[in-house]
């Protein structure tokens, strides 16, 4: 098998997982570059780096959001870690549809090309990632930029749908003998629920943006008021996907954090069944709250009361997860390895993001907060410190298993501390700006807001330095990393003293060779539970 053939036509879940990882890192660099330009423009009250070209500012906001969400976080958390480890954890030979797995990856590089092209062609897609009509209609954005952004969303949707079908079928049908659904590790449950969410929500998004595409190019009037359409319909279709999407991003992170905390406290996760039900509840409730993004469009009072209450209910299963992790930490033999540092950072910062979310769930308060930097601060605490920290924790936890090479612990710790400090310096001031009424998506602002904006922009520069240190850490690992090949990794210590189960199925990835062989199991494992 030649090198080109192996990587282009691969049907191995491990090779495809590594391709997703490389792709996600490239997309992350593109998206981070855009975010830095956004923050540099906001470092002063008047026109700064973009010379007053506000359209370019909004184009960067659109590109940053689409690249970060669809091309970075989802491909790595679901595509890379999910593909690589889910079959190993359930004792499967490979994914159920191995060739489908290949095409679901190769839908993504054209999506990145479309996003970059949409930024560079004509005036760009200055719509924000929500792509609301009438701003995204042909009258406001006449060039092909918005069409390209829609095509990028179509491609990522196809990729995610095919992947979701694959994950569901693999999980249900390809578990090894002795692994029942209830025994599956929390990361497998997380990917399973995420796949169900993708399967139910993505068709709605695809329908919504396809109608927009037809409005733009075929003179239909779905969102055109003069033709009897309604732009609010688009908001309902978009957010029926958009809210489950935030859980699609964070639920795999929950799974990773569970594994990391379990390993580095030498304890099984507190309340495993409760954790599974909590993930399922979060996923279900995520479909019932979409209009909390739309309190200011003129919903009647009953709708606002319902969506406020339903949104607050999501805090209950989320709280169960947070407190179960804390209960696992309590009395555990903590080892502050790098993945554990990121997991602890995740717990602290994700909780803060959740608390600001509870405030935003109130319809009456949200009227004041809507479209201010308070919202930007909230969702970046959840994404930039929830999803991102869990993603990096997953890389440092499983990276040695994927590549058979150890990372430099000093570099990794510097990466953690600098990132932890810098993301707080960026996003904490945004809450203060939002409370004072600074609107989102607007590059110029009154002088009164300059102080916190300067602080936030300096934090952005610091975060870029931390990202570069993280990349250098990966480079050192891959070029000069201490060899961990051919070792059979022993199971974590807590299993040896855990009488109920000598080797849990969740640790199959820890007891295979590092890196896992091209064919993980020469014969299928049988897991025997000792009771």
Curated annotation (Swiss-Prot):
Major location (coarse): mitochondrion
Keyword NAD assigned: no
Keyword list, A-Z: Calcium, Copper, Electron transport, Heme, Iron, Magnesium, Membrane, Metal-binding, Mitochondrion, Mitochondrion inner membrane, Respiratory chain, Translocase, Transmembrane, Transmembrane helix, Transport
Annotated binding of heme a3, by residue: 378
Claim: Iron is one of the keywords in the record: yes
Transmembrane region(s): 18-38, 59-79, 103-123, 149-169, 185-205, 237-257, 269-289, 312-332, 340-360, 385-405, 414-434, 458-478
Record-linked SUPFAM superfamilies: Cytochrome c oxidase subunit I-like
Membrane topology annotation: Multi-pass membrane protein
Positions of Fe(II)-heme a binding: 64, 380
Cofactor details (free text): Binds 2 heme A groups non-covalently per subunit.
Gene Ontology biological-process entries: aerobic respiration; mitochondrial electron transport, cytochrome c to oxygen; respiratory electron transport chain
Annotated Ca(2+) binding sites: 41, 46, 443
Localization terms from the record: Mitochondrion inner membrane
Quaternary data: Component of the cytochrome c oxidase (complex IV, CIV), a multisubunit enzyme composed of a catalytic core of 3 subunits and several supernumerary subunits. The complex exists as a monomer or a dimer and forms supercomplexes (SCs) in the inner mitochondrial membrane with ubiquinol-cytochrome c oxidoreductase (cytochrome b-c1 complex, complex III, CIII).
Job of this protein: Component of the cytochrome c oxidase, the last enzyme in the mitochondrial electron transport chain which drives oxidative phosphorylation. The respiratory chain contains 3 multisubunit complexes succinate dehydrogenase (complex II, CII), ubiquinol-cytochrome c oxidoreductase (cytochrome b-c1 complex, complex III, CIII) and cytochrome c oxidase (complex IV, CIV), that cooperate to transfer electrons derived from NADH and succinate to molecular oxygen, creating an electrochemical gradient over the inner membrane that drives transmembrane transport and the ATP synthase.
Entry's family note: Belongs to the heme-copper respiratory oxidase family.
Name of the protein in its database record: Cytochrome c oxidase subunit 1
Organism per entry: Candida albicans (strain SC5314 / ATCC MYA-2876) (Yeast)
Lineage: Eukaryota, Fungi, Dikarya, Ascomycota, Saccharomycotina
Gene that produces this protein: COX1
């Amino acid at each position: 098998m030649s090198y080109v053939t192996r990587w282009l036509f691969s049907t191995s879940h491990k090779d495809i997982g590594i391709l997703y990882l490389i792709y996600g890192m490239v997309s992350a660099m593109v998206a981070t570059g855009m975010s830095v330009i956004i923050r540099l423009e906001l470092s002063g009250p008047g026109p700064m780096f973009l010379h007053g070209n506000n359209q370019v500012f909004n184009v960067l906001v659109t590109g940053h959001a689409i690249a970060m969400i669809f091309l970075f976080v989802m491909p790595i958390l679901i595509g890379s870690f999910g593909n690589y480890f889910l079959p190993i954890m359930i004792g499967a030979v490979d994914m159920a549809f191995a060739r489908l797995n290949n095409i679901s990856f190769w839908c993504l590089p054209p999506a990145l090309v479309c996003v970059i092209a949409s930024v560079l062609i004509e005036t760009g897609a200055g719509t924000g990632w929500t792509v609301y009509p009438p701003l995204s209609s042909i009258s406001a954005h006449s060039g092909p930029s918005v069409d390209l952004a829609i095509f990028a969303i179509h491609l990522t949707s196809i990729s995610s749908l095919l992947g979701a079908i694959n994950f569901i079928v693999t999980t249900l049908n390809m578990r090894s003998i002795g692994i029942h659904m209830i025994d599956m590790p929390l990361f497998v449950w997380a990917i399973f629920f995420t796949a169900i969410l993708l399967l139910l929500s993505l068709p709605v998004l695809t329908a919504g943006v396809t109608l927009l595409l037809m409005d733009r190019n075929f003179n239909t009037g779905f969102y055109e008021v003069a033709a009897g359409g309604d732009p609010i319909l688009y908001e309902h279709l978009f957010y029926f996907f958009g809210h489950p999407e935030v859980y699609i991003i964070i639920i795999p992170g929950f799974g990773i954090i569970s594994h990391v905390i379990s390993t580095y406290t030498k304890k099984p996760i507190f309340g495993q069944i409760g954790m599974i039900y909590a993930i399922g509840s979060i996923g279900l409730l995520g479909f019932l709250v979409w209009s909390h993004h739309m309190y200011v469009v003129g919903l009647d009072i009953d709708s606002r009361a319902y969506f406020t209450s339903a949104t607050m209910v999501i805090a209950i299963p989320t709280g169960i997860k947070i407190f179960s992790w804390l209960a696992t930490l309590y009395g555990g033999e903590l080892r502050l390895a790098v993945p554990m540092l990121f997991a602890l950072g995740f717990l602290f910062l994700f909780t803060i993001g959740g608390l600001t979310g509870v405030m935003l769930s109130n319809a009456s308060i949200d009227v004041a907060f809507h479209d201010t930097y308070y919202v930007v601060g909230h969702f970046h605490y959840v994404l930039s410190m929830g999803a991102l920290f869990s993603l990096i924790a997953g890389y440092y936890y499983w990276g040695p298993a994927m590549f058979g090479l150890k990372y430099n612990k000093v570099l990794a710790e510097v990466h953690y501390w600098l990132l932890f400090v810098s993301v707080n310096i960026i996003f904490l001031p945004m809450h203060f700006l939002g409370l004072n009424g600074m609107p989102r998506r607007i590059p110029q602002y009154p002088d009164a807001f300059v102080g916190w904006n300067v602080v936030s922009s300096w934090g952005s520069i610091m975060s870029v330095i931390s990202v570069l240190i993280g990349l250098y850490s990966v480079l050192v690992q891959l070029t000069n990393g201490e060899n961990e090949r051919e070792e059979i990794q022993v199971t974590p210590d807590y299993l040896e003293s855990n009488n109920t189960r000598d080797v849990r199925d969740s640790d199959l990835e820890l007891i295979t060779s590092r890196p896992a062989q091209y064919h993980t199991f020469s014969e299928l494992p049988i897991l025997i539970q000792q009771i």
